[in-house]
Swiss-Prot record:
GO molecular function annotation: manganese ion binding; RNA binding; RNA-DNA hybrid ribonuclease activity
Compartments, as annotated in UniProt: Cytoplasm
Name of the protein described by the UniProt record: Ribonuclease HII
Record GO biological process: DNA replication, removal of RNA primer; mismatch repair
Length: 246
């Protein structure tokens, strides 16, 4: 696990005010609330390779509203990059945490995602009094009150921003990993279980960036260890793809 990036633009003269917000008893902030809300989302739970990225974003209420925000999955790569630049420029605070494939295999993808969410919120907790998290679970041990919001990446602007920051960060890293392992074409599929990726697993077996606890990777590895000419049957890999963790 590592915190890839963190930025805070809050000024220290507001320390007392921020502390009073942080310890507010209001359970869920509304439009009238003075709480600064961190939106939290992840990218990369489902892929067979690479890290899971989790971002937290707190908007600066004194900066212009960012138009065009949406769930990162609904945006083109070019549009995500454009919005990413605006988000990190106008956010009061933001953070991104990467949990690598080794840690994912050690504690499982669910726990890795929860860990990433907790660390991402900790990265903005000096300004955020509340966290709103995409999904149906709130991680334990957060430094501030929080709620889970199913479908939040299509409903809440701060979560939309977090989804974009997480996605852009992870995609950039997968391009870097492609340079190290070009045979897998991580730049094309970003580690997801596409036919291209499954074919590369058959031919080359897994690399250190692959998640060995995921069924298609495990099947490919077992095939190589058994010395088979072909690493598993293509139909078996397709079936394994369907049961890989989401």
């Amino acid at each position: 696990m590592k915190i890839l990036a963190a930025n805070a633009q809050a000024d220290s003269s507001n320390t007392e005010a921020r502390q009073s917000l942080l310890f507010s008893q209001s359970p869920i902030p509304n439009a009238e609330s003075r709480l600064l809300v961190a939106g939290v989302d992840e990218a990369g739970r489902g892929p067979l390779a690479g890290p899971v990225a989790v971002a937290a974003v707190v908007f600066d209420p004194n900066k212009p509203r960012i138009n065009g925000l949406d769930d990162s999955k609904q945006l083109t790569a070019e549009r995500r990059e454009q919005l990413y630049a605006r988000i990190v420029d106008r956010a009061l605070a933001w953070s991104v945490v990467l949990i690598d494939s080794e840690e994912i295999d050690r504690i499982n993808i669910y726990q890795a995602t929860m860990l990433g969410m907790r660390r991402a919120v900790e990265g903005v907790a000096h300004v955020a009094g509340f966290a709103r998290i995409d999904g149906n679970r709130v991680p334990k041990g957060l430094p501030c009150p929080a709620e889970a919001l199913i479908g939040g990446d299509a409903l809440d602007r701060a979560i939309m921003a977090a989804s974009i920051v997480a996605k852009v960060t992870r995609d950039r890293l997968m391009h870097e990993l492609h340079a190290q392992h070009p045979e897998y074409r991580f730049d094309q599929h970003k580690g997801y279980s596409t036919p291209m990726h499954l074919a590369a697993l058959q031919t080359h077996g897994p690399c250190p960036q692959h998640r060995r606890s995921f069924a298609p990777v495990r099947l490919a590895l077992e095939g190589r260890e058994q010395g088979s000419a072909a690493i598993g049957d293509p139909e078996q890999l397709q079936v394994a793809q369907l049961v890989a963790p989401l």
